[in-house]
Swiss-Prot record:
Assigned keywords, A-Z: Chaperone, Mitochondrion, Transit peptide
PANTHER family for the chain: COMPLEX III ASSEMBLY FACTOR LYRM7
Protein name per its UniProtKB record: Mitochondrial zinc maintenance protein 1, mitochondrial
Family as reported in the entry's similarity comment: Belongs to the complex I LYR family. MZM1 subfamily.
Record-linked CDD domains: Complex1_LYR_LYRM7 (cd20267)
Cellular component terms per the entry's GO annotation: mitochondrial matrix
Function per UniProt: Assembly factor required for Rieske Fe-S protein RIP1 incorporation into the cytochrome b-c1 (CIII) complex. Functions as a chaperone, binding to this subunit within the mitochondrial matrix and stabilizing it prior to its translocation and insertion into the late CIII dimeric intermediate within the mitochondrial inner membrane. Modulates the mitochondrial matrix zinc pool.
The organism's place on the tree of life at top rank: Eukaryota
Annotated GO MF terms: protein folding chaperone
Annotated compartments: Mitochondrion matrix
Protein biosynthesis among keywords: no
Biological process per Gene Ontology, one example term: mitochondrial respiratory chain complex III assembly
Principal location: mitochondrion
Species whose genome carries this gene: Schizosaccharomyces pombe (strain 972 / ATCC 24843)
């Protein structure tokens, strides 16, 4: 299978997983994937390789860093965290740093 087709499938599967249950966003993501591949159909091999790397990186970012949130009745949100979701402590953003 060609690298471009593998990248397309990788992005398609990532968007299906991440945007499951949200048909409007899933349709927009699919449209963006199709448009991106259509616009880069006739590019040089070097540019194609770069775009394939970018596409695979986007799929990985979607899987690891995008979560869906659903508003609950008590002004809180329920997050849909998947097995692939990256969970960090964000210590670098929560520690207060004061100049001396």
């Amino acid at each position: 299978m060609s690298a471009a087709k593998q990248c397309f499938r990788n992005l398609w599967r990532a968007s299906n997983s991440v945007f499951e249950g949200d048909p409007m966003i899933l349709a927009a993501a699919r449209d963006k994937i199709r448009t991106g591949f259509h616009n880069h159909r006739c590019c040089s091999p070097e540019e194609a390789k770069k775009e394939i790397q970018n596409g695979n990186a986007v799929a990985e970012i979607l899987r690891r860093n995008v979560v869906q949130a659903e508003k609950q009745s008590n002004d809180t949100y329920s997050l849909k965290i998947r097995k692939t979701t990256e969970i960090n402590t964000n210590r670098q953003f929560t520690e207060k740093k004061f100049p001396r």
